[in-house]
């Protein structure tokens, strides 16, 4: 009796469909990653006194400071505001990335993405 479809060793023919779905998911993930790389988010701290823009590649592309926060006697506050805005922008990029990957994987991956 001849076997139809499947792989040697008795794997079912549905394995072909599974492989096709995996390849499709991989293409979608690559496409989503490209879109994320092109994304930018801007986060503000200190009521908008400090703005930091981060790319999807997690590179800081812009830092904007309001004159009122540039106080030579309080550099520590400025440093804190820059750090807060940067961390928030990075958090937003991570959130976008996770949401995008979740759409593709349907929640699969156990936190790998």
UniProtKB/Swiss-Prot annotation:
Keyword Lipoprotein: no
Pfam families from the UniProt entry: YbaB_DNA_bd (PF02575)
GO terms under cellular component: bacterial nucleoid; cytosol
Gene Ontology molecular function terms on file: DNA binding
Region ranges (Disordered): 1-45
Gene3D superfamilies cross-referenced by the UniProt entry: Nucleoid-associated protein YbaB-like domain (3.30.1310.10)
InterPro entries per the UniProt record, alphabetical: YbaB-like_sf, YbaB/EbfC
Keywords tagged on the record: Cytoplasm, DNA-binding
Ranges annotated as biased composition (Gly residues): 1-12
Bias-annotated ranges (Basic and acidic residues): 27-37
Family to which this protein belongs: Belongs to the YbaB/EbfC family.
NCBIfam families xref list: DNA_YbaB_EbfC
Function, in words: Binds to DNA and alters its conformation. May be involved in regulation of gene expression, nucleoid organization and DNA protection.
Subunit composition and interactions: Homodimer.
The protein's name in its UniProt record: Nucleoid-associated protein EUBREC_0329
Organism per entry: Agathobacter rectalis (strain ATCC 33656 / DSM 3377 / JCM 17463 / KCTC 5835 / VPI 0990)
